[in-house]
Amino acid sequence: MVEPAFYRELAELLPGRVRAGEPMKKHTTWRIGGPSDVFVEPEGREELRRVVCYASRRDAPLYVIGNGSNLLVADGGVRGIVVKIGKGLSRISIKGNKIIAEAGARLAGVAAAAGEAGLGGFEFLAGIPGTIGGAVAMNAGANGFSLGNLVEEVLLLDFHGEFCRKTKEEMKFGYRSSIIQKAPLILVEALFSCYPRNKEEIREEMERFLARRKLTQPLCYPSAGSVFKNPPGDTAGRLIEMAGLKGMRVGDAQISTLHANFIVNLGSATARDVLALIEKAREAVLARFGVELKLEVKIIGNCQAEVAECRSL
C-alpha cells in the first residue's frame, strides 16, 4: 500500500473528495476490481491540478480514470492514487459550430447537446458509454467514425501540474491511439469542430446507430466494450468466433454469444476470470490464424499473479 500519510494529506488538501480503500468495481463498467489505496474525485481543474502536483511531489503512483468503460482493474486493487474525472469536470458549451467539452462529460451528453444545437458529427457516439477524456485519449470510434476527426484543439495537464494546449495534428491521432497514451498527460478539455445539420436527421441517425448496437452487442451485461483492437483488414470478433471461442466461459466471465470481441460479467466475474479468457482468445487466434491480438482495454493494478495463474489453466 502507499503511505498512510498520502490519504491524510490529500484529505486535508481536498476535504470531502478523498476516500481510502474504495472498491474499484463501483467505478468500472465491467463491475470488476479490488480497492484503491486512495481514491479522489476532484471538483474542477484546479483541484485536479493539486492532486497531480501532490502525487508528483510525493512520487506516488497516479492513475486517472473516467467512466471506467474501457478498463480492467486487478482483483487485488490499485496501489497508489486513483483520480476519477467525473461530474466535477463535465461542462459542455456550444459556440457557433464548436463544442467545448470537459474531460468528465459523458459521450451521450455531448452527442445529445450537439443534436439539440443542430450540429452533426457526434451521431456515432449514440449508446457508447464513457467520457470525453478517455474517448479522446484512445481516439474512440465506431462504424468507421473516430472522435479524433472532430477535435480541433485540446487542453492537457502534465504530471508536473502544468497546463498546455495542443492542436489536432499535435495529438497524433491513430487507430485507438493518441499521444496521451504514450506520455504522462491528462485531457482536461477538448474543442470540437462540427457542422450544421437538420435536427431530425441527427435524431434518426442516432437511433439507427443505437438500434444496431442493441442488435449486435451484449448491452444487458456489464462489459468493457471491445476487448481487442481490430487487426488490419479483419475484426477481432470474427477471428475469435472462427477460432471457436464464442460463448466460452471462465467463472462468471464469458466471451459473449452475441459479439465475440466482448467479454461479459454474468454476475460475479473477477479480473482473473477475464484475463483467463483474454489469454485463451489470444492463444487460439494466434495458433489458427497467425494473428496476434492487441488489447484495446487498459489494465491497471498488479495483474501479474492473475496472468501467471491463467497461463497455468
Swiss-Prot record:
UniProt keyword DNA-binding, yes or no: no
Disulfide bonds: none
One of the GO biological process terms: regulation of cell shape
Domain of life: Bacteria
Gene3D superfamilies attached to this UniProt entry: 3.30.465.10, UDP-N-acetylenolpyruvoylglucosamine reductase, C-terminal domain (3.90.78.10), Uridine Diphospho-n-acetylenolpyruvylglucosamine Reductase, domain 2 (3.30.43.10)
EC number: 1.3.1.98
Reaction it catalyzes: UDP-N-acetyl-alpha-D-muramate + NADP(+) = UDP-N-acetyl-3-O-(1-carboxyvinyl)-alpha-D-glucosamine + NADPH + H(+)
Cofactor(s) needed by this chain: FAD
Domain FAD-binding PCMH-type: 31-197
Pathway note: Cell wall biogenesis; peptidoglycan biosynthesis
Localization per record: Cytoplasm
Alphabetic keyword roster: Cell cycle, Cell division, Cell shape, Cell wall biogenesis/degradation, Cytoplasm, FAD, Flavoprotein, NADP, Oxidoreductase, Peptidoglycan synthesis
Any one GO molecular function term: UDP-N-acetylmuramate dehydrogenase activity
CC per GO annotation: cytosol
Keyword NADP annotated: yes
Active site feature: 176, 226, 296
Enzyme class: oxidoreductase
InterPro entries in UniProt: FAD-bd_PCMH, FAD-bd_PCMH-like_sf, FAD-bd_PCMH_sub1, FAD-bd_PCMH_sub2, MurB, MurB_C, MurB_C_sf, Oxid_FAD_bind_N
Family (UniProt): Belongs to the MurB family.
Summary of the function given for this chain in its UniProt record: Cell wall formation.
Protein name: UDP-N-acetylenolpyruvoylglucosamine reductase
Lineage: Bacteria, Bacillati, Bacillota, Clostridia, Eubacteriales
